[in-house]
Amino acid sequence: MNIRRKLGQNFLNSKSIAKFIVDSAKISKNDIVYEIGIGKGILTPFLCEESKKVISVEKDHQLYEETLAKFSKIKNLKIIYGDGFKQYEKFDIFVSNLPYSESKKAIQWMLMNKFTYGIVMVQYDFAKKLLAEKQERKAVSVLAQSGFEMKILKKIGKKNFTPNPKIDSAIMSFLRKDTFSKELIQSVNLMFSFRRKKLQNIGKKLGIEIESNQRLEAMNNNEIIKFAKKIRKI
């Protein structure tokens, strides 16, 4: 099975939306742009026009070969075959239309990498989850809100993809506020497996003495991050 289909990838087919994504990234001629999932390459030429260099990573070998041949004359483009989350490239701006199945993984990866700004296409419902308030928050909501200033820039309908997905998408911006370690991310995820419990009871589950009857879901993001650091002694 094609990797992209297995991952739940639908290819953007609108050049006007591709241009909107690139324009929203606020790229300068001094910027190095990192793109995970080159796909059919609809974003890539626009990214190359605006930036110093574009590094695009594709894990589907057929798509990698196709885009390598298609964009062979673009001087400031480096195309890598492999997993974009496992490369060690330095960059300023992250731009991607990711498979929806990798959205949570992508957010956690973004939190650990020191770039300035990102524009990412995600499932619309996932975008709302990232921006959720207290009672509706998940671990990924707290982490994303603590690490980035986020906005939904545009809702994108199904007809703008091939094949048409069953759900709508959203273009989101991510302005860096903080960078988190893998250990801190794991700590927040662990805490949210007990999200309905009081801190005192969470402490017992984790073998830590905590004198507080406050519930995790009642805490603000800063309090949760501070508590997560205490658990892991980060």
Task: Locate the predicted segments by residue.
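Conserved Class I S-adenosyl-L-methionine
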Residues: 166, 194-196, 201-234
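Catalytic cores of RNA-modifying enzymes
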Residues: 1-190, 222, 226-234
